[in-house]
């Protein structure tokens, strides 16, 4: 406990800085900032005034490390950096920290359009966004391709190809790679696409309509039809925007709290367009003020890949505006104003974001409480020492002993944790021996990169024979984790599941019980992930091995088929005429492909 470090705390400087609470094996438990380090650390000595969570943390602290900074701004930035890199156990945990997806147009002589997430490279790309979902980006790029015939290929492919790719054949690219369009004309199309992304749709539409009418008056009806289609696709892009608008680039933030959870929502405007409201959730908030939570969030949010606009709006309850402004200036290298709403429009937008935060938080808590109720009941049924926070579910998949794969699905008190999922390509040749496959998967799981993360409960898709396998692996690796094997009934029907545990008789649960339905959902998710992972592996191998075996199919035709159809499944569903549309594929070759693909899929499925 910290009392034994009383002398160290008393000798701490009365200056700005950051402190780290460090536990066993040099594990960082908490990172905090302070305007006065000595005063802040002294607060931890008032043990009776601390929350239970902080008391538990302090019982694990072995030492305190101090970093002095020049001012509060540097302390805020350093704290955010350390929290992001160290992920301390007792700090606020932000969920959904993904970068916003953007659309990029490269600064190449013949620019490429693409979807992008990550840190910005301003010397190489123009960025447009942010968008609230990858689906919105994909649809917008597709519409821009159809409207302006822009390339999406890599620069390497662009510089090396000798003939147009399938994008040209399906009228989504003008093939600048092989001079099917002049550089000036292509750059004009790029300019129109950029203007569209900047919100100048009306100007671009008028240009396209003028050209369409000109072509029509000159009786060049084929070209006029092309420009007519461009206008149609341009209008589709316009339809995707939502109702709210704001004159300047701005982000509106709100924060709503209940219990130990906070929801921070952001509503973004770029080029007068609304890009939607996105909720983020922060855990472990009970000991922090709204100012602390939001200031840390904003620095992390804009210190990743999200470029701050010229102004952001925060609730009136946030008072540290100047500190946030100075921190964001250091992050963005440009002035960013942090404002309170001053007029009805701004207040309405902040209220809209607040309402979204409130709704998202309420739904999150409802889901959490429902899930917690199931987990409490599960812990009683399976005699677990505590309510599980991390459940790992394991399943295997193979076809006649080939293409063997094992998967791990993870669930917590908030639902499935998809970023924690893992798949294991079975290295040994076990010819479909499920016991040996499970042994390899569990051995690799508990001796690999994430061996330090110990779950509270394991659920194995298997029967009584798996119990000894799991027990042996855990004993060899000195892992103490409760587990159960879940097997379907004699007819492999859901609802007749039997459970097998070490030292207990087999048992079943009522088909309509909440825990039974929950366990079925865990098992089904593992099965889905196993099948999906296996299918991807199978299709990849199928592409390489099976398409290559078809006489007349080389690498170029194989790539053209996959570029056009996207998957083997889509090829099998295609018509003869559709396959003939691929450059270089005759009617006879198309018939061979269809026959071969459908036969192989029949065998595989």
Swiss-Prot record:
The family database entries (SUPFAM superfamilies) matched by this protein are listed as: C-terminal UvrC-binding domain of UvrB, GIY-YIG endonuclease, RuvA domain 2-like
**Which UniProt keywords are present, listed alphabetically?**
Cytoplasm, DNA damage, DNA excision, DNA repair, Excision nuclease, SOS response
Keyword DNA repair part of the UniProt annotation = yes
List the Gene3D superfamilies hit by this protein, alphabetically.
5' to 3' exonuclease, C-terminal subdomain, GIY-YIG endonuclease, UvrC, RNAse H endonuclease domain
Q: What GO molecular function terms would the record report?
A: DNA binding; excinuclease ABC activity
The highest taxon in the source lineage is Bacteria
Its Gene Ontology biological processes? Answer: nucleotide-excision repair; SOS response
Name all UVR domain ranges. 202-237
Subcellular localization, per the record? Cytoplasm
* Domain GIY-YIG residues, every copy: 14-92
Q: InterPro entries per the record?
A: GIY-YIG_endonuc (IPR000305), GIY-YIG_endonuc_sf (IPR035901), GIY-YIG_UvrC_Cho (IPR047296), Hlx-hairpin-Hlx_DNA-bd_motif (IPR003583), RuvA_2-like (IPR010994), UVR_dom (IPR001943), UVR_dom_sf (IPR036876), UvrABC_protein_C (IPR050066)
**Gene Ontology CC terms, in alphabetical order:** cytoplasm; excinuclease repair complex
Q: Does the keyword Repeat apply?
A: no
| Family per similarity comment | Belongs to the UvrC family.
Q: Which NCBIfam families match?
A: uvrC
The function of this protein is:
The UvrABC repair system catalyzes the recognition and processing of DNA lesions. UvrC both incises the 5' and 3' sides of the lesion. The N-terminal half is responsible for the 3' incision and the C-terminal half is responsible for the 5' incision.
Assembly and interaction partners:
Interacts with UvrB in an incision complex.
Q: What is this protein called?
A: UvrABC system protein C
Q: What is the originating organism of this protein?
A: Wolbachia sp. subsp. Drosophila simulans (strain wRi)
Q: Give the gene that encodes this protein.
A: uvrC
